[in-house]
Amino acid sequence: MNTSRFTDTRRWFIGIAATAFTMTLAFPAHAGVTTDGTLGQGGALAGPNYRIPADLGQQVGGNLFHSFGQFSIDTGESATFSGPNSVNNIIGRVTGGEVSFIDGTIRSTIPGANLYLLNPAGLLFGENATLDVSGSVHVSTADYLRLGDGGRFDAHTPGNSVLTVAPVVAFGFLDPPAPITVNGGFLRVPDGQTLSLIGGDITLHNATLYAPAGRIDLATVGSAGEVLPLDHDLAVQGFDTLGALTIERDPVVARVTVDIGEPLGEIPLGDLDTSGEGGGAIFIRGGQWVNRGGGVFADTHGARAGRDVDVAIAGNVRFDQGAWLSTDILGSGTGGSISFSAHDLNILNGSGITTETFDSGNAGDVTITARNLLVDRQDS
């Protein structure tokens, strides 16, 4: 087992970017957390540790619905959802037309419950943003969520909502969607869970999305349509235009590291990372993707078979400044495969797309479909 070569490869990736860049995002004052009164009592909640019990919303079967006028959490603050153990999904919308600024902790005390947070006006996560949720987390700027059995949870026109016991089946967009930005934050879900960002343009700047042995979904769209998370796909339907994904990593900013135990110990994480026992899946959909120095890892540890990375970009993709995508394997299982489609794919300045084995397991396949492909890995 060549553990040293695996960890050296990850650390080599960290140091490969040679060109620094800077980005400044203002984090303005905000209105805190208010309920809009459409599902329960309306009014401002007391901070800085906002408590959101079930009776402020409406429970239908395993779905607990909440409706907020504003939802922003400042540095050092928290918002804690609570309710009975019968809740499977906490589904919150923001209707007031203001961007949600999250620089504190979003928490749930309901065991295993998934969290949906919907704000059509936009979402910005700061460098202190964290998640403390035992289920999956889905963040979106969609106008509505389509539920099974004819249900609908509408943030654009709340009166159109039809609340049902059925799970969420689609994220629906009516207007050109607002962006989602993660500026320096570390957003993590527990092992085997899903972390989704589904909205307009998506920007990750020195940020880390981590779903160990789980799944990450990113869909960036630019018009009306629906995004459907399926078991083995992330379908985008009815869109005239798709949006832009930007991943930027300043090489002077230290990466988040995690201790995954022996034999690997402490390893640095990618900007998108589902690595773990058996690996995890990553689905990316959009109109274009610029990756400057970012890492996308779905590496497999142990004896279980890995899962795949599936990227479908309608337009141009540019990997630059040491950007990297891998489904490497350290163990006896089979590594995940990479399926990557784009109109134009440019891999530049030390960047790469790889699947490699560092142990007895077999590496997965890499399939690239592009009308134009340029590979120039010489560092500039």
Regions found by a protein language model. Name each.
Residues 2-380:
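Extracellular and secretory-pathway beta-repeat/beta-biased strand scaffolds
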